[in-house]
Amino acid sequence: MMWAASRYTEAKLDPISAELFKDIDKDTVDFVDNYDSTMKEPTLLPVTFPSVLVNNNTGIAVGMASSICSFNLEEVCRTTIELIRNPDHCVADTLKAPDFAGGAKILYDRAKIEEIYRTGRGSFKLYAKYTYDKSNNCIDITEIPMTSTATSESIIEKVIDRVKAGAIREISDIRDETDKSGLKITIDLKRGTDPDKLMQKLYRLTPLSDSFACNFNVLIAGSPRVMGVKELLNEWIAFRMECVRRRTYFDLKKAKDKLHLLRGLEKILLDIDKAIKIVRNTEEEAEVVPNLMIGFGIDRIQAEYVAEIKLRHLNREYILKRTQDIEELEKLIADLEDILASAAESAR
């Protein structure tokens, strides 16, 4: 069985999506076989920001459940930076409250928020946002709780049911005016109706208000753990530091390998004619590399590299251009080794 052609499965990603996969080709995370062992897939993504707190995550598995509210990306990143600088930083000072992509408003209670941040458990209420159009005597609802499974159509049906049941008498009409500019449910009011009191009634009787129950249950090293926000961010920081360490090792090895090749090329520069003579006078192809090794005191890897150079490139100009990178590579290697030796540099 093969996967579908890319035209059926491809998706256009926003630029920030690149941060999910950044440096994935530099051994930053482990790869395992996919379901049929035909290719490799990452066990985790080397995401450059704490995505677990930026996306609204809810799910149920065997014997466990998870419900993680989303937060503002800028606030999450700022909080993470402050925690790196100061492990005793108060999370609530920079991470004000949950922030849902669909909008709506939260009845803010700092004590409740801090309890959720500390334990990873708790709940809060979300309310639809509205404005009152006095000239047309109507309420425009522009944001609904993202936690609700209700759509604008089902909300309208619920309101109509309440009107028919006699629970709501202040509404003369309700309609869906949602368009490309965004969601909009318009409620026409009867004369003399207080819009704020009506909305309080709608919050009680319809899905225009909802609760979000937090259960920050995540898998850490394959085991489920309920964690507070600070603990979660510290766990992500440790993960990201490991990604940086692995990326640095990858870059360091690549730089050292390249420097090693250029060191061999540098020796050839001392006597290009000798290199050409060795190649020309060698009777069998298999003997070219050993003869270069003997002639210039280089190892097999360096000799293989030199032997693969085209004849037209065996000139002083070409070799000088290549060996000019040696000084930059030495500086890069020193910088990378400093990063590996210093946790502070890795965090930066």
Give the positions of each predicted feature:
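Helix-hairpin-helix/helix-loop-helix acidic hairpins
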Residues: K26-K40
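Conserved catalytic-core motifs characterized by acidic clusters
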Residues: M1, D30-N34, I174
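C-terminal interaction appendages of subunits in large macromolecular complexes
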Residues: A4-R7, A11, P15-E19, I24-D27, ...
